Amino acid sequence: MKVLLTGSSKGIGYKIAKDLKAEGHMLALHYNKNESTLEALLKEDKTGSFSIQADLSQQEEVKKMVVNTIDKLSFPDCIINNAGIAESANISLAVSY
């Protein structure tokens, strides 16, 4: 299966990436700032998997990521949107008094 996985360089996304790679899937592994963990994961890859950088808060970078993924994978069979973006907020705004 061909999979696009966002937020794959750490945490839950990295665990998902490791498991999918172990099962032999072809992966497009998104990261924003931490490529080194994915380099180690993909070092001996034989499926054609690759990493791709994008800041998901920037619409043009998301478009570029999708185009590059389609160029390399054709169309993915599965997209796992693990990454998220958040704006900073004062935590007291979320507290009920």
Residue ranges and their predicted role:
Residues 69-75:
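Glycine-rich phosphate-binding loop signature in dinucleotide/nucleotide-binding domains
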Residues 20:
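Aromatic pocket-lining residues of Rossmann-like dinucleotide-binding sites
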Residues 63, 86-97:
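Conserved mid-core segment of classical short-chain dehydrogenase/reductases
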Residues 49-51:
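Hydrophobic/aromatic anchor residues within beta-strands of the central parallel beta-sheet
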Residues 53-65, 97:
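The beta1-alpha1 cofactor-binding region of Rossmann-like NAD(H)/NADP(H)-dependent oxidoreductases
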Residues 7-11:
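Conserved glycine-rich cofactor-binding loop
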Residues 6, 76-84:
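Rossmann-fold scaffold of SDR-type NAD(P)-dependent oxidoreductases
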Residues 23-39:
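Conserved glycine-rich Rossmann-like NAD(P)H-binding loop of the short-chain dehydrogenase/reductase
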